[in-house]
Structures are given as structure tokens and as C-alpha cells.
């Protein structure tokens, strides 16, 4: 049964904190724990989580704000569950941050936290709603409102993160899948298919692959394993098709092998899709090559405020997706939520966020995308780019007119087959110095003497992005750069960017919890600085104001 936690709003007269000497109590109230309690813990709307609990009269739940606070502390400090529970039981700062006055209050076993995670995960699978993300947005919106953080300008950046999976070779992954299927079989089926399984049960999958030396040997074993998997799938389909291990084996076979006239052939490495299975323990992790590095896991996308007039910047959005998802798709998915919750009008990103998905999402929106770099080859500096032309739009955001660098304005019309076109006066173009220098893309046609410039709506959007990029460069202020340190702050508790959990949902929860902790620490520093300056100016006023009266 759900019950809100209001006990912490009435502190006990005698508590662990109140028994501290005055000096230590002052340190406690000036630490992160005070900010965590007031700026996060007290802001949590527990009713968001009411749907996880029974409506029938029954035993009340462990306070949701305590459980959520523990998730944030685990992510923020990079603790294991054991370390988290020890700190919950004995660390005065942690208990103070969670509104617990006495060391014996709020006792529960660590399994309660596991059940809470299970409820969150089950609800997400059923509804597609991440309640932890909802709570993060609710708390952050309240912080933004109360601390008067401007949200018109925001910046966004993505980073690669890994879940807690083994970096397995292709052969090792296949053998591990076979071993997992063997474990779910009945004794009779294990005995019936013992000849098929026997070569792959002598030790771990890693032991099996260690004995295979050379590329040719690996290819031979891949072919043998493929034939075995094909045979097992046929033999076990009727009895085990609903089992998760069988479904994983079927997926691996489809991704790694091709069937030609009942003969099994392993696919070449280059034929494998980036979304192919990377681990039997994490079915959503994907593969990506970025630069000279290879990654297995997920991509996290972080958005934060960046108005130069803000004394405090806060993270407003955290997304996690398989790492083969393009940055422009992440921007497109985040945009409606950011517009609904904030006053977003300018979004600053790197070059990776420009693309068809983001262009489509930004069409007709009052949000300006500024990229600090542009995808693709650098254009010829001698020739004019479409960004050098001025395009006018109607209220429906449809391009209507275009003005060339020489100042000639003409209407934009549909092309004969696809795209758009503009036709310029041949007499003006013939006398244009830019045309004489060979810098203009518009050229005369055989049947029509007018100079033709053909382009597509996609090219217009790309040109507008380039124009915004060049204007941003002229300002000499790179507002995007600092978001990289924010990403680093969110990833810092996780060694080498590898999280202690598996699966997209759990990875998302841990990244959101870490972002909450980053926000709390920023608020703590902000409030500390404010208190310092207010104390300093009060002291300055008390010292010099009497002197001014004497001199007067």
C-alpha cells in the first residue's frame, strides 16, 4: 500500500545531528547533505510512484523518496549496492540527506531496494514510462523555477557508455549462447542431444575460444558452430520456442549466418549489422565505430542550460539509446519534451546533431540550432555555397524567394521532376563579377537563357545550419565547449565509462541518477557562493558605513 513520507518534515527533538558539537553541526549543514535534502529530497513528488503499489489496505511501502535518494547516491558516488547499504546504515551525512534523524530509523533490508527497481522495470516494460525520469524532470523543473535559471539557451552532447558486459569475440558469443540453451533443457533432452553439445561444454566459452588459433581456424569453427545451432533450433523449437535462451540463439543464428540450400555459411564481419547482439546478458547493447575506436554498449545524450547570464547551469534532459542511434535522432526525440518543459529557443550542439531527423523535427519550430561544426567535406572557399544566398520563407516555413550574393532576388519554384529551382536574369548574371570569376553555381541552360540554380529543401536546411554556424563563429564565444565537462561529471563515478548494470532501462536509470547528483552539487556550490558574498557584503557594510557617517 502506498503511503507518502512526511515524517521527515517534523524533525525529532533529540537526534544524531542535534547531539553533534556546534562546530560539527555547522559543517554538516554546510555540506552537500543539506543541499541534497532541501533541493532534491524534499522536492520529490512521491505520488508519481503510487501506481507501483497496491491500492488495497496492506503493509505500507518503504518511503519512495528514500529509495530514490539511495539510487541517486549510489550513482553519484559510484558505490556498489553493499557500499550503498553500509553508508545508509552508518553514514550520518547520508542519513541526514535522506531526512532520517536517528540511526535506528527507517530500517529495511537491501532486498527492498531490489524490489523497487524490479517494480520500476516492470512498469516501464508494460507502459513505456520511466518513472525515475518523470521524477527527475519534475524535480529539475522545480529547481529551475525556484532558482530562476534561464532555459532559453541550451547545449547538448552525447557520449559512449558501456554496460557491464564481457567484450566477447564472435565465436565466444556463439558458444556462450549454446551453453545457455543447454542449461534450460530437461535431463532427457540433454542426454538426447549430448553429441551436439559435448564440444562446447568443456569449460567456459572463453576457454573454448582460447584454444582456437588463427583466422582460418576461427572461420572453420564458426561454420561448425553455425551447423550445430541450425540443428539445435530445429530439434528444440516445439518444446522451447518460448524460452528466452532459445530466442537469443535464434536471433544470433539469423544475425551471424546465412542459409543457402540447407547449407549454413557464416557471414563476413562486414556483413554484421551494428545492432547485432553483443552479449547474451544485454540484448539491447549495440556496436559502433567512432573515429579509430570501437564501442559496445549505449550512447548517452545530455542537455543542459547555457545562458551566459545564468550563475547556475542545470542538466535538463538525459537520454540513453543503443550506440548505433544517430545524434540527430536523439535531438529529434528530446525536442518536444524540452519545448514543453522549458523556454528553449536556441540549441547549441556539435556537428553530429545535424541531419534529416533533426531537420524534420525543427521544421516549423521556434528553436534555432547552432552547430559548432558541420558534417561533410569543407566547401570550396572560392565558390559560393547555398549558405551565401539569402532565402525567404512564408509563414508556413516554405521557401518563396532567394537573393544571390550580387543582390538579385527571384522566386523559388518547384523543379521539373523533384526539388526546387530558381532562375536568374541572364543580363544581370552576365555582368555579375562573381559569375565572371567563376564563383557562382547558377549556370545558363541550352533552351532557357536564364541562369538556373537547383537545390532541395534538405540542402536549404543544411545551408541555414552553415549560416548559423558561421554567425556563431563570428561572436568568438563557444558556449558548447563546457557541456563536455558536464558529460564528464555525469560519467565520472563509473570507471572508464563502464556502468555496473546491464540493459537499456537500468543504464538509463543510473545515468539519470548521476545527472541528478551533478545538479545537486552545482546547486550546493551556487548557494555556498551566494552565502559567502552576502556575508562578505554585510561585513563590508558594517565596517565602512559608520566611518562614512563620522566623515559626513
Regions from the language model: what does each represent?
Residues 84-97, 139-140:
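DNA-recognition alpha helix
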Residues 52-60, 320, 501-503:
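A short glycine/serine-rich beta->alpha loop
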Residues 68-78:
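Alpha-helical support elements that line or immediately flank enzyme active sites
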Residues 1-56:
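Basic, low-complexity segments
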Residues 83, 102, 106, 114-552:
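Anion-binding and metal-coordination hotspots
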Residues 48-54, 96-103:
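Short amphipathic helix-turn modules centered on a small-residue break
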Residues 64-65:
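Double-stranded DNA-binding cores of transcription factors and transposases
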